[in-house]
């Protein structure tokens, strides 16, 4: 089993308190909604959400921070310990009030947020820096999650960054405020468009402005990479040139914590020795998973893989239609010639691809009738098909020269041909001298030569022989 990457998160820890309920009336005391509480939940917020995102990705995580010597601070420390992300690097400061953000949620919407915190500079700067620098050699990457609550002061940032540079450890920062000078010499920052505009004094209205702002950040702060997150547009990177990586999100329910997800994913990927472009692409995917959830959330690789699978299916499934749907489409075809062929196409190979490409050359629209799993079993035996009908349909749909795929359950495509009324039928040359199903309806029948030695049966036999 591969060793887990070890990452240190330094920053402002918070407790997110969610009050869930229903709202169906207005208060008689004031023009405000009345929320009937159903349940309350607590999550780690701020830098704690970065931690949870890293854990979801499979990293080993330690946390360095300062919390108040109070009930909320103790709860934060206990929650981190339960997650296995304590590390003994969290200090408690007397007289400091730990951050807690209470959100009232009704009908999946946030009604109000109530903050309780002391957003002032910590008194334990030197102690925190000492804790961090004594342990830096244990980590592949350091992430600074700055929420402007006082933990990441100028001294703390500069001292940690300088030591990371000395030890050649990448340090990634989610910044806060207008003055980014304390982040000088970091590997990269992840400001959003608004934050980058405020930090550079450049109103980012177009790509030219974006390039100017992102270059200014890179040059003035001596960053290895300069990044700006662009919400629904994706992530912009300036390495040697400006490049924008499009966002992957299709459904957005809540953007809370999406920046934490981006920081965590970039850190994890760089700790795993991936290049920056691959890291950004993965961060976009992780963010797409998170914004489709309610509240601060995380994304794991299983969810990211499922997102990619669903995207792949969605891209191809628009070609997979019922006979009725295709018949309706063909009713509007005008002068276009429709070509029809059919088969099991169990293990798609080069012979299939050439056959279908040739079939498409005969007309303007190619429809493939695909035998269902039950139909294949009746024709080929109980050991077939190797691939399910949906998998076979998706693979066929991925071919540019296939326009539509229609699955049929009968032993022959006769009923399908009657419904679609194509202009041309195509079959393999082995049908020479034989009656082609549907030829009494469609008079134009074309036969295509197969590629010698290319067949699903031959492939299956080779696989079985190799296992002997």
From Swiss-Prot:
Its EC number is 2.7.1.167, 2.7.7.70. Pathway: Nucleotide-sugar biosynthesis; ADP-L-glycero-beta-D-manno-heptose biosynthesis; ADP-L-glycero-beta-D-manno-heptose from D-glycero-beta-D-manno-heptose 7-phosphate: step 1/4; Nucleotide-sugar biosynthesis; ADP-L-glycero-beta-D-manno-heptose biosynthesis; ADP-L-glycero-beta-D-manno-heptose from D-glycero-beta-D-manno-heptose 7-phosphate: step 3/4. The keyword Amino-acid biosynthesis does not apply. ATP binds at residues 192-195. The active site is at residue 260. GO terms for molecular function: ATP binding; heptose 7-phosphate kinase activity; heptose-1-phosphate adenylyltransferase activity; phosphotransferase activity, alcohol group as acceptor. CDD domains: RfaE_like. This is Bifunctional protein HldE. It comes from Campylobacter curvus (strain 525.92).
């Amino acid at each position: 089993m591969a060793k887990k990457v070890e990452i240190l998160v330094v920053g402002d820890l918070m407790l997110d308190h969610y009050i869930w309920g229903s709202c169906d009336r207005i208060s008689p005391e004031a023009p405000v909604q009345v929320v009937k509480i159903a349940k309350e939940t607590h999550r780690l917020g701020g830098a704690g959400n970065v931690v949870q995102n890293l854990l979801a990705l499979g990293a080993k995580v330690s946390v360095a921070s300062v919390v108040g010597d109070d009930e909320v601070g103790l709860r934060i420390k206990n929650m981190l310990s339960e997650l296995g992300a304590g590390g003994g690097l969290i200090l408690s400061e007397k007289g400091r009030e730990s951050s807690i953000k209470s959100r009232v949620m009704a009908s999946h919407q946030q009604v109000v947020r109530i903050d309780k915190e002391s957003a002032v500079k910590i008194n334990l700067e030197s102690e925190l820096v000492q804790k961090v620098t004594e342990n830096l050699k244990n980590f592949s990457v350091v992430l600074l999650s700055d929420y402007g609550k006082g933990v990441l002061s100028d001294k703390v940032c500069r001292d940690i960054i300088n030591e990371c540079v000395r030890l050649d450890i990448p340090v990634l920062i989610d910044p806060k405020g207008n003055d980014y000078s304390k982040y000088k010499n970091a590997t990269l920052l992840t400001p959003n468009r608004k934050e980058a505009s405020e930090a550079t004094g450049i109103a980012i209205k177009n790509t030219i402005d974006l390039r100017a702002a992102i270059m200014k950040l890179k040059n003035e702060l001596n960053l290895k990479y300069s990044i700006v997150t662009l919400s629904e547009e994706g992530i912009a990177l300036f390495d040697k040139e400006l490049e924008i990586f499009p966002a992957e999100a299709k459904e957005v329910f809540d953007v809370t914590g999406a920046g934490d997800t981006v920081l965590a994913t970039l850190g994890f990927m760089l700790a795993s020795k991936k290049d920056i472009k691959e890291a950004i692409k993965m961060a976009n995917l992780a963010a797409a998973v998170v914004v489709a959830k309610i509240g601060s959330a995380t994304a794991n690789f299983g969810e990211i893989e499922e997102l990619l699978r669903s995207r792949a299916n969605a891209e191809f499934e628009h070609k997979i239609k019922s006979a009725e749907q295709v018949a309706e489409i063909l009713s509007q075809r005008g002068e276009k010639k429709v070509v029809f062929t059919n088969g099991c196409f169990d293990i798609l190979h080069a012979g299939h691809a050439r056959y279908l490409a040739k079939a498409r050359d005969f007309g303007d629209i190619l429809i493939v009738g695909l035998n269902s799993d039950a139909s294949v079993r009746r024709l080929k035996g109980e050991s077939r098909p190797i691939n399910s009908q949906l998998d076979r349909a998706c693979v066929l749909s991925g071919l540019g020269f296939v326009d539509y795929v229609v699955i049929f359950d009968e032993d022959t495509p006769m009923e399908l041909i009657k419904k679609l009324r194509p202009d041309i039928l195509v079959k393999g040359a082995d049908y020479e001298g034989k009656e082609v199903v549907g030829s009494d309806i469609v008079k134009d029948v074309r036969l295509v030569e197969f590629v010698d030695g290319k067949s699903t049966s031959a492939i299956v036999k080779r696989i079985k022989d190799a296992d002997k």
